[in-house]
Every structure is written in C-alpha cells, then in structure tokens.
Amino acid sequence: MSEVRRPERSGGPDRPIGDLHPDYPLPDVDHPVTRPFWDGCRERRLRVQRDRETGSFHWPPKPSTWKGGRLEWVDAKGTGTVYTWVLGREPFLPAFKDLLPLAMVVVELDEGPRLVGHMVGCTPDEVAIGRRVRVVFKPLTERVVLPVWELVR
C-alpha cells in the first residue's frame, strides 16, 4: 500500500492550487497501475480500462499483466448516472471540514464501470439516484487533478 502524500507547503509539483488544506490526502499519481488514469485526469480525460478481447470495461484498474495483458486504457465519455449517494455532514478528516456538506456519489458511467467521487456546482437537494452527471476536473496540485461530478442540466 502506498504512503499517504500531503500537499507540499512550498514549491514543487505538489504545492496546493488555491486554498487546499495542508492535511488533504493526495493519491499516488505515480503508482504503475493507476498512473494512466491520473495522467488522463491531468489532460482532462477520464480513462478506464477495457478488455481488448471482450470489449468489457474494468474499474478499479488492474495491473497490465491481468488477463494476459489484454487490458488497454481508453477514454470514457465522462457521463453517467448517480447509482447511489450519501451526504457527508461530519468531517472524517480535518482537511474535509470546509467542504461540508459534501454529496459523495457512486457514478455508473455510460460504459458500465462505477466510480466514486463527489458532486460540485449543485445543492444536496438536487442530487438523486438516476440523475445524469458529467465529469469535470478539479486541480488540487500541478500533478493531482481529481475527477468530480456535476449535474447535466
């Protein structure tokens, strides 16, 4: 398991953009299994793995040797529906206190896989199972860009 990284307080590619809390946990964008996903996010592209033989999509990412190396990274449309959601009212980490209330969602992509994220640009009253959403990208540092979700209006 990777060590939790935190934003750098001075200089470097992991210095926060905006007012990111200094204890905000950052994903390991250099992990060999997930690096293509994070590279895609930096390029504002939502990437998932697809089996070259069956055409089925896979999430979470698998090692490149899984299924004999048949998986390839492809761009998803970036749209889907809210499969389920929960409203966070208590900060499970101090870094998330200023984000509350936070609508956390599981989005079923049009391609099939389900990704976890949170909603932006709407009130919790507007979030509902079955609502159409699209991905938008939220830069946390120069290297870490998160996929988050907004309602399709």
Predicted regions and their residues:
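A short, acidic/glycine-rich surface segment
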Residues: 66-68, 89-94
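Short, conserved beta-turn/loop elements at beta-strand boundaries and strand-helix junctions
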Residues: 85-91, 140
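Short, conserved secondary-structure segments in the cores of folded domains
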Residues: 72-73, 105, 123-125
